[in-house]
Each structure stands twice: as structure tokens, then as C-alpha cells.
Swiss-Prot record:
Keywords: Acetoin catabolism, Oxidoreductase. GO terms for molecular function: oxidoreductase activity. GO terms for biological process: acetoin catabolic process. The gene is acoB. This is Acetoin:2,6-dichlorophenolindophenol oxidoreductase subunit beta. The lineage of its organism: Bacteria, Pseudomonadati, Pseudomonadota, Betaproteobacteria, Burkholderiales. Pathway: Ketone degradation; acetoin degradation. Pfam families: Transket_pyr, Transketolase_C. Tetramer of 2 alpha and 2 beta subunits.
Length: 338
């Protein structure tokens, strides 16, 4: 039976159900229990935005408050995974991955390969991503492309409560390291979520809107900006098909290519910095594999190549908008076949 849950509560429920099902699932992070683990503060906070609130009461010391040292507790989580546990490490912001990058890309991502397929590292690293939270340059980045570049890592960025729960359960059960990206501006988004546990396989994009004129490919918060743009375009007689990638590594290029072959036009939207991001990757692959199907040049909608501004006015201008997406789609409709 389904009921409406926010993305924040969908994450909480996924972790709760997996911790109940599997005693090897543990969780580490800063203030995920309470005020630095002080007895009087236990379960008072549940992380910076309260995502894990209530889990300590059910699962006790399997949730561990850690010092403000991402390098230490991410390293501990990776080591625990190598020893048979299924840790979930929560970083407040993906921006802090920099201080534990060696543990992630030089250790966790490579163990299976270095040990001839015999080693497993079932660790999930959860982190908030994206701008729009008025949190300035060091707490607002969309660094997903950094991790898709690294073989051995799986990268997930859901856009709905349903997908969030199913993909997080899949991530916890997966035997490889997963970077699970949660857009901070989507935590309050509500949608239908089944009560029971379910897993959504990685590498399967979702067509969230059918259309015949132009394909809009994106992920995370930008899915909702794309839907807003599509509603505007529909009033002008332009029907946009929207592909929600859901997982960025593995990347479902088959669905993207099939959509482009049906519409002949492509707009790729990415909140990440425009150099070497998901949009450039998809654009290159479509140009290589489906050039003959294109009726117009590929359009990319990305932020400028700058740090995320602190000024609310500038930050709003920095983030790709529905108006920009609609303008890019209109441009493809006017383009001639090259």
C-alpha cells in the first residue's frame, strides 16, 4: 500500500527497513544521533536536516555519531565494508568529499579490481548536493561528475520520493561503493511511496514525460525544472520527452539514444559546472552514436563555470531555470539538419 512521503522521510524509511532486515547495516556520521553523542541529546537532532531522526531509538548503537572528520569516519566505513559490514556514511554536504577523496577513489573504488574480484566494499556514502539553499560556495556544489569519472563507483541522484527509497535500498544491498546524492532542495518534495521494501535496479533511466518533438535529459532537481519547461512548451505546441537518468554511473545511454532517435532533438540539463559534466558526456555519446538521427544541434543547459554565489539574487541566476530549458528546446526546434 502506498502513501505520500517526503524524500526526507523516504530516506529515513529505507534506512530503517534495511537496518531491521540486515543486522550488518550500520550508520556513521556527524550528529546523526544527536548533539555529538551527548547522553542528553541522543536522538534530538538526527543529522543536520533531521533525516535520521528516530532511528537511534530503534537501532541503538548501530548509529554512531562521529567527530567532524570526514576522512576518519569515511575511512572507517570503507574498512568496515571490507570486513563484512554494510555501512552507510552520511556527509552533510558533498563538498566535504574533498577531505576523504583518497579513501573513496583510491581505496573503496579499487578494492574489487585489485583483489581479482574477490573483495567487496558494500558502503553507501550519502551526501547533500546542489545549490539554492543559501549555503554559499563551500556547501552548494553539484560534484556528481567527479565520481562518475572513477571506475568502481556507482553514483545515484534521485528526483522523487519513490525513486529515492527504491534506489537507496538498492544501494545498501549493493556489493560495491555507492555515492548517493540527495538534492537538499528536494527533501520536502512529497510523492507516493509503497510501505514495504523495494529496490530499483541501477542503470535504468525513467521517461517521466512522453513527447515527440525534443528530448530533455537530466537528473535530480533539474527533472522538476524540465517538467515545468515542458508544460510551457506544450502550450506552444512543442511536446518534450523528459528522461530522468536516476543513476549516473551506471548510465542508461540506451534509453537516451532511443529517445533521441524518436524526437531527433536533444537538450541536456545539468546543475554541475559545465566543464566535463554529465551533459557534456551525454552530448558526446549522442553525437558519436546517433548523429544521423539529429535534426538540430545538441543544446546544453548548465550553470556558468564559477563557484556558487552566496548572494540570493546571483545564486538564483546561477541555477539553470525552466525558462532557460524552454529556450534551449525552442532553439532545437528552429535548427536545420546538419
Amino acid at each position: 500500500m502506498a502513501r505520500k512521503l517526503s524524500i526526507k522521510l523516504a530516506i529515513n524509511e529505507a534506512i530503517d527497513q534495511e537496518m531491521t532486515r540486515d543486522p550488518s547495516v550500520i550508520m556513521l556520521g556527524e550528529d546523526i544521533v544527536g548533539g555529538a553523542g551527548a547522553d542528553g541529546e541522543k536522538d534530538a537532532w538526527g543529522g543536520v536536516l533531521g533525516v535520521t531522526k528516530g532511528l537511534y531509538a530503534k537501532h541503538g548503537d548501530r548509529l554512531l555519531d562521529t567527530p567532524l572528520s570526514e576522512s576518519a569516519y569515511v575511512g572507517a566505513a570503507i574498512g568496515a565494508a571490507a570486513c563484512g559490514m554494510r555501512p552507510i556514511a552520511e556527509l552533510m554536504f558533498i563538498d566535504f568529499m574533498g577531505v576523504c577523496f583518497d579513501q573513496i577513489f583510491n581505496q573503496a573504488a579499487k578494492f574489487r579490481y585489485m583483489f581479482g574480484g574477490k573483495a567487496e566494499t558494500p558502503v553507501v556514502i550519502r551526501a547533500m548536493v546542489g545549490a539554492g539553499f543559501r549555503a554559499a560556495a563551500q556547501h552548494s556544489q553539484m560534484l556528481t561528475p567527479l565520481f562518475t569519472h572513477i571506475p568502481g563507483l556507482k553514483v545515484v541522484c534521485p528526483s522523487t520520493p519513490y525513486d529515492t527509497k527504491g534506489l537507496l535500498i538498492q544501494a545498501i544491498r549493493d556489493n560495491d561503493p555507492v555515492i548517493f546524492c540527495e538534492h537538499k532542495n528536494l527533501y520536502g518534495l512529497e510523492g507516493e511511496v509503497p510501505e514495504g521494501a523495494y529496490a530499483i535496479p541501477f542503470g535504468e533511466a525513467n521517461i517521466v514525460r512522453d513527447g515527440k518533438d525534443v528530448s530533455i535529459v537530466t537528473y535530480g532537481l533539474m527533472v522538476h525544472r524540465a517538467l515545468e519547461a515542458a508544460a510551457t512548451l506544450a502550450k506552444e505546441g512543442i511536446e518534450a520527452e523528459i528522461v530522468d537518468l536516476r543513476t549516473l554511473s551506471p548510465l542508461d545511454m540506451d534509453t537516451v539514444l532511443e529517445s533521441v532517435e524518436n524526437t531527433g532533438r536533444l537538450v541536456v540539463v545539468d546543475e554541475a559546472s559545465p566543464r566535463c559534466n554529465i551533459a557534456t558526456d551525454i552530448s558526446a555519446q549522442v553525437a558519436q552514436q546517433a548523429f544521423g538521427a539529429l535534426k538540430a544541434g545538441i543544446e546544453m543547459v548548465c550553470p556558468p563555470h564559477t563557484p556558487v554565489p552566496f548572494s540570493p539574487t546571483l545564486e538564483d541566476l546561477y541555477i539553470p531555470s525552466a525558462a532557460q530549458i524552454a529556450a534551449a528546446a525552442r532553439k532545437t526546434m528552429k535548427g536545420g539538419k546538419h
